Structures are given as C-alpha cells and as structure tokens.
Amino acid sequence: MEKEDLDLLGGHIAEFIDNPDEIVSYRRVPTQHADIVAYQRMRSAFNHMTVMFKKDMVLKAGNYEDGLYMEDDLLWLNMIAAGAKTGNLDQILCKVRVGAGMFERRGGLRYLKLYRQARQRMLERGQISYMEYAKSVAIQAIVALCPGFVRQFIFVKLLRKRK
C-alpha cells in the first residue's frame, strides 16, 4: 500500500439504481487529512464500503460502539480524536446500488432520534461544536421528515456530483 502512514483510508463511489453501467451520481469525499477532519464534523468523510483501516488504531479509538445507523461516523471521529492519520484516494473504488430502500432508511422519527443521539455524543466529547450540532440536526430533521421521493432527490441531485 502506497499510503502506509495512514490509519484510515477510503475513496469515492459511483452510484446506480438498477443497472451498474448507468451511473446516476458520484459521492466524492475529501482526500487530504485536514480536509477530512473538517468535513467529518458535518458529514461522513468516508464511503464505508471503500474503507480499510489499521486494527490497532480502531482498538485504540475504542472500536465500534453502539450507535445504530451512525456507528461508522462515530468510529471515524473517535479514530481522528485518537490521532489517526486519514486519507481518501482520488479514485472511484466501487459502484454502489442506491435504491428506494436506502432513502427510506434515512427517514422518519426513529432515524432522526438516533441521528440526534449520535450527534449529541459527538458534542459531549468535544468532537463537534454546538453550532455544528445544531446545524446538522436541523438539516437532518428536514431531510428525515420529508417524503422518501424528496429525500431521494436531495441525495441524488443536491448532495452528489453528476460527473
């Protein structure tokens, strides 16, 4: 691995609905450690399915913790807080299906409650500021409480790149 000094490494993904040859969007993430640290405070700076990490750093950071739907984000922030060096390759590493089920799972009162609880943990640990907490929960409330087709539009058309 070229990036041997990194503890946590991922990359970009291409998203499709039914046909892997018909890409509908791309989820590009920051590639440099400083940009990743800043981005991670509001949104996940890693595409989970592309991630590899060093086991010793995961254990040093406390391993995965309970946080339904947010385990990865909590782990990434805990690893950064424990001193992990991070990076993302500036490459599409895999294609990912993003059907209606994904958009349905990211909505509703239960999802919003779990999201708020995880963000509250991050706030209490000093991993995010109160303003970042308030802004992210307010935005997520709007997204979580809108109909699934609106959420799909937000994710595919507004939060992702077309090329």
Task: Give residue ranges: language-model regions.
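Conserved donor NDP-sugar-binding/catalytic core segment of glycosyltransferases
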Residues: 1-25
